Amino acid sequence: MVKIRPDEISSIIKQQIEQYQQEVKAVNVGTVFQVGDGIARIYGLDKVMAGELVEFEDGTVGIALNLEAKNVGAVLMGEGTRVQEGSSVRATGKIAQIPVGDGYLGRVVNSLARPIDGKGEIATKENRLIESPAPGIISRRSVHEPLQTGIVAIDAMIPIGRGQRELIIGDRQTGKTAIAVDTILNQKGKDVVCVYVAIGQKASSIAQVVNTLQERGAMDYTIIVAATADSPATLQYLSPYTGAALAEYFMYTGRHTLVIYDDLTKQAQAYREMSLLLRRPPGREAYPGDVFYLHSRLLERAAKLNDKLGSGSMTALPVVETQEGDVSAYIPTNVISITDGQIFLSADIFNAGIRPAINVGISVSRVGSAAQPKAMKQVAGKLKLELAQFAELEAFSQFASDLDQATQNQLARGQRLRELLKQSQSSPLSLEDQVASIYAGTNGYLDVLPADRVRAFLVGLRQYLATNKAKYGEILRSTNALTDEAQTLLKEALKEYTEEFLASAK
């Protein structure tokens, strides 16, 4: 039997007393006195900061948004069904942040960057704040590199550059998401990381986008942030900032990124819902006074960084839905004034069978022309002019019965150019194919064809160039310009293929 020595016990107790350190930890705690509709009003929490995360007894997290004299209004980031009146809340001292890293590529995540695709956890090493300040003027460079969408009408007449913000605006069901998805598909092999943020959409629509991207091998360089229609308003409001934070990680490591916010109208509606429940005073269309700041602080994060910061870029394609083509509503006018141009999609053009249904007359790109490849500049100027003249003549010709030959020729050319701009969904075109199509249209090679055969001719021409004049494509890919040699090859191909096509049509 072991003998217990009293001196040993006393020395152990003495040692423990000497090593004891009293730590006083002050925790900022409050009490819920009202809860409902995803909003909690909290008494106490005197030292809470605006935008600080607060944690409820059941583990639900909220964001303190309203700091009033006697209480704090917090929005819940979750269902919050177990949050009750009288339960305690503590301030965490943190503001909303998410993990970021290369592990997110190919994954579908929610507004808090947690995976929802059933493929397991995502390994990350660093975190980023969901809301971080936009790069300053000194940190930026002017937009000078092209971002090709693969859509002829956009790349020729409304060009987009890396670091630009280009709005896609139009009524529902006019092909806004289709343009965004085609742009992602066209980034394959161009070392551009794409982030698609779905805000308030049906889960089935998001699944459709994921399937399209997977089938075409585009998920390898894409992250999808999904806040479905049944998500709480708080998560729909946060999702665009999460997408921007994920893209910023790549931008600040010198990579090029493309972020699509589909769509910001639903984010504004979610923010309006939160603000009205928080009893903030409503303004125009019942939106709160800071709804402009909601979008401006998001879109200003898109930038082309200077060489010192690694020359990375973030290009933003926000989508906004209009009602009956009303561009003068509150949210559309706000976002138009923030962005560097807009692509306007018209329901009338869509119903007339012209897809993509881009209204070239009122669509504009304010900075992208500086980034347009030289080859496209060489052929696009003439296309713009001829289409503008055609639109004017077409309106006039509806009232005139007999037209002279020159006018008839111009109308016929315009109809063929319009056919040239039609494009199937999920079939983006390379620069050399776009240049060949436009060159054929503006130089009269399509005038000899019936208008309904133009698209079939162009498909055949692209195949003919790839097999018989491969050097043409090589020159354009290496120089980005339509050199004399490339032009000669293109003319030869057009002459040879036109004869072949007309002979086969007989």
Curated annotation (Swiss-Prot):
GO terms for molecular function: ADP binding; ATP binding; proton-transporting ATP synthase activity, rotational mechanism. The record marks 363 as: Required for activity. ATP binds at residues 170-177. Gene3D superfamilies: 2.40.30.20, ATP synthase alpha/beta chain, C-terminal domain, P-loop containing nucleotide triphosphate hydrolases. It holds the Pfam family ATP-synt_ab_N. Signal peptide: none annotated. Its EC number is 7.1.2.2. CDD domains: ATP-synt_F1_alpha_C (cd18113), ATP-synt_F1_alpha_N (cd18116), F1-ATPase_alpha_CD (cd01132). It is found in: Plastid, Chloroplast thylakoid membrane. InterPro entries: ATP_synth_asu-like_sf, ATP_synth_asu_C, ATP_synth_asu_C_sf, ATP_synth_F1_a_nt-bd_dom, ATP_synth_F1_asu, ATPase_a/bsu_AS, ATPase_F1/V1/A1_a/bsu_N, ATPase_F1/V1/A1_a/bsu_N_sf. It catalyses: ATP + H2O + 4 H(+)(in) = ADP + phosphate + 5 H(+)(out). Keywords: ATP synthesis, ATP-binding, CF(1), Chloroplast, Hydrogen ion transport, Ion transport, Membrane, Nucleotide-binding, Plastid, Thylakoid, Translocase, Transport. Produces ATP from ADP in the presence of a proton gradient across the membrane. The alpha chain is a regulatory subunit. F-type ATPases have 2 components, CF(1) - the catalytic core - and CF(0) - the membrane proton channel. CF(1) has five subunits: alpha(3), beta(3), gamma(1), delta(1), epsilon(1). CF(0) has four main subunits: a, b, b' and c. Belongs to the ATPase alpha/beta chains family. This is ATP synthase subunit alpha, chloroplastic. It comes from Chlorella vulgaris (Green alga). The gene is atpA.
